[in-house]
Amino acid sequence: MNQSLGPSEPEKPQDNTAEDSTEPTPDNHRADLSELRGIPKKQTGIEGFEDISHGGLPLGRTTLVSGTSGTGKTLFAMQFLYNGIVKYQEPGIFVTFEETPADIIRNASSFGWDLQALIDRGQLFILDASPDPEGYEVSGNFDLSALIERIQYAIRKYKAKRVSIDSVTAIFQQYDPAGVVRRELFRLTARLKQANVTTVMTTERTDEYGPIARYGVEEFVSDNVVILRNILEGEKRRRTIEILKLRGTTHMKGEYPFTITNDGINIFPLGAMQLTQRSSNVRVSSGIEKLDEMCGGGFFKDSIILATGATGTGKTSLVSKFLERGCLDGERCILFAYEESRAQLSRNASSWGIDLEEFERQGLLKIICAYPESAGLEDHLQKIKTEMMAFKPSRMAIDSLSALARGVSQNAFRQFVIGVTGLAKQEEITGFFTNTTDQFMGSHSITESHISTITDTIILLQYVEIRGEMARALNVFKMRGSWHDKGIREYLISNAGIQIRDSFRGYERIISGSPTRINVDEKNELSRIVQNVQALEEEGL
């Protein structure tokens, strides 16, 4: 074994205490059932993990973090230690069976973590158990007694509260049989539990959804199991984390997306989002007077609006008017564009009389442009979250969601939309999204991924053929918590943007794409309109 890295190498103790000489057994390793209730937890400091684990890792127990190569196991183990030192003032021990201490320090620096400074201050100790590059042979019975004693001594010397071991797979690769290694790992976890340290132990698996660990025994010596995955969906990889078990305590079930940023692991606990945000009765303008009238006075301040329609129906024009109105009212606005460049957006907006560049110069508008294929959905979500938290807008827009849906599963896309809408509602931001439908004319699904239930207001834009000419139709299809115009209005796109006209009179089946002319009794129609107006006046609308 190589030398350990720290202020000074802990010497192997010359005598063992009675406690150390007592061999652990499965009976005294298992806690009494009464002790399993209300187990205290230690926070990891990893963003989102406390949400899905209901508070962190069980105090004084061992957690197995399993995953295929490149899933972030070593990062999880090191971030657990680093956050413990920096955020909670808890010294830690990192036991490495694979990488050298120098490599670990160098890799951590890419996240801005100065491990050498922590080592110099005696807050972190790296115990090097990596194989000797010269190679060696082991004869006789294998046991981890020497390593266990070194770890115990380091825990006492540095008053460590956290231990990370990376990775136990290396032990199986060096020694056999597996049953003997399992026995020694059981001894190790028992000693760590006696020392009352919270431990993260990593192991490798061969398949994303196969056995938990490569050798099939590692999970039985730990109290808790966390699985990291890096799944190939289409042409993109998607990272997820799943807590398989936290013995004796509760946690959230299922997989949750995460990404690796410059700050380390960032988990999106979508299932942990609470519907506790306040609901505002304040209205904000869409930037189009007629559309505000159709929506009963405008959109609700904290609502999510979805404009859906075929290409060329004016969705980006609606977004531009929405953002212009916010900037004119002195509100900060942010646009995430995934189909057009900044120059193209500015040029198109100027044709409608909107100067986006001037709003940017005033600091009222920020435009983020990116190709959907440039990153995975989790990375896009993290980018949106980072930009919104830094810029703190009152309005945000995404143009378009359908571009982000290319090449990903419906479940991943839906989770992305939930993440964005949840963030917008949490920050009381008015969100405006666009969605491009595949069908050029006629009835169609509003959204293929069934995200319509997540949004508060849906504006349906559609092409219709009337008397041999192409026209455009607009309908406020849905608006939660408010009266809205049910009519199907004709609209034009001119130099002033979208201009909404009256309803299509004398036609039915507009939405189906097969408009049919009907005879209208003008006298009865006028009487009906007067009655509707009187009814609205009586209701105070």
Curated annotation (Swiss-Prot):
Binding site for ATP 1: 70-75, 110, 245-247, 249, 251, 261
Region (Disordered), start-end ranges: 1-40
UniProt keyword list: ATP-binding, Biological rhythms, Hydrolase, Kinase, Magnesium, Metal-binding, Nucleotide-binding, Phosphoprotein, Repeat, Serine/threonine-protein kinase, Transcription, Transcription regulation, Transferase
GO terms, biological process: circadian rhythm; regulation of circadian rhythm; regulation of DNA-templated transcription
Xref: CDD domains: KaiC-N, KaiC_C
EC id: 2.7.11.1, 3.6.4.-
NCBIfam families the record matches: circ_KaiC, PRK09302.1
SUBUNIT field: Homohexamer; hexamerization is dependent on ATP-binding. The KaiABC complex composition changes during the circadian cycle to control KaiC phosphorylation. Complexes KaiC(6), KaiA(2-4):KaiC(6), KaiB(6):KaiC(6) and KaiC(6):KaiB(6):KaiA(12) are among the most important forms, many form cooperatively. KaiC interacts with SasA, activating its autokinase function and leading to RpaA activation.
Name of this chain's protein: Circadian clock oscillator protein KaiC
Species whose genome carries this gene: Parathermosynechococcus lividus
